[in-house]
UniProtKB/Swiss-Prot annotation:
Location within or outside the cell: Cell membrane
Sites where the protein binds Zn(2+): H18, H22
Molecular functions per Gene Ontology: metal ion binding; metalloendopeptidase activity
Name of this protein: Putative zinc metalloprotease SP_0263
PROSITE patterns: ZINC_PROTEASE
PANTHER family (UniProt xref): MEMBRANE METALLOPROTEASE ARASP2, CHLOROPLASTIC-RELATED, REGULATOR OF SIGMA-E PROTEASE RSEP
Species in which this protein is naturally found: Streptococcus pneumoniae serotype 4 (strain ATCC BAA-334 / TIGR4)
Amino acid sequence: MLGILTFILVFGIIVVVHEFGHFYFAKKSGILVREFAIGMGPKIFAHIGKDGTAYTIRILPLGGYVRMAGWGDDTTEIKTGTPVSLTLADDGKVKRINLSGKKLDQTALPMQVTQFDFEDKLFIKGLVLEEEKTFAVDHDATVVEADGTEVRIAPLDVQYQNATIWGKLITNFAGPMNNFILGVVVFWVLIFMQGGVRDVDTNQFHIMPQGALAKVGVPEMAQITKIGSHEVSNWESLIQAVETETKDKTAPTLDVTISEKGSDKQVTVTPKDSQGRYLLGVQPGVKSDFLSMFVGGFTTAADSALRILSALKNLIFQPDLNKLGGPVAIFKASSDAAKNGIENILYFLAMISINIGIFNLIPIPALDGGKIVLNILEAIRRKPLKQEIETYVTLAGVVIMVVLMIAVTWNDIMRLFFR
């Protein structure tokens, strides 16, 4: 149960933060956001704000989404013959079109729609008590959809495709950008929880209680200058020295040279065997000044991003489904993190957030990266691609993503449960 809750919480935070990036910059760019949803499926709460956005909470706590006017399949489901109820404003214009049996207005006019245009000419035409009538529709009118969600209509001037090219570009980039920001913030939290940022550039190390070095009397902080015949100048050189000195050995002992007050002291220690790796019981020292901790959030996030990009490069040149993890693998990893405490959960949250940010920047049309490429092409050509071409390109990207997701999920299931 804890694993399920951790998965829902981590995935939910990451997706909502990602979608909020799109939401915020869409509004700044003059694009109408018709709905900002937390969760998926049937809605359990809805409120339409003064900004025209419907804020909803939906029953399945799995992420969320934004509906931008003119973006993707955001359309109003009204067809010829659709029965609706019209609520009129004092000036005679339609201010609400009700497609559901919910939010009924006793003063509303029943109409069977024969024609409408909510984007350009802003009118609705149909039969009212067997008589054909035409009404002007207010620019900020709302539509109550079949499930009771009330959203604003989307005239052309507030649609995605009519925003400036830079407005569209930053709107598409803002989702991944927010994932990177979330990663930095979570790493800050971790660094402050741990009392500082790891200092891997020095040979001054923290000696862990009950570790191999502590058992031979090495103090809590020690400067290790040599292991065997290998010089130690930083954390990486210490790891390499231990690996070299213990390679192909059973129950090895190590001669460790420690500098104390200008003089060297040598101790002989038996490292702890941990699944074939030999541990001295040391950790990097920490920098606890505010500036180091502040910068540490950025550097830790950057190091994580570089590792992910390196793995992605290897995956491109050496394709292997076993190197990919889908929802099942993420659930397994979140369950493992939950068993090991809050710090592991936070680290997992930061890493997955950065991972998703990078993944979304891959130039596949269904992803934010693909949309950014289309924005760049539009900027170069000084005109957008034809709508039909953009639709087909996006559809191809969706097909690729669906096939990849099915393959990865199937591979996850086979790897985790049948091997």
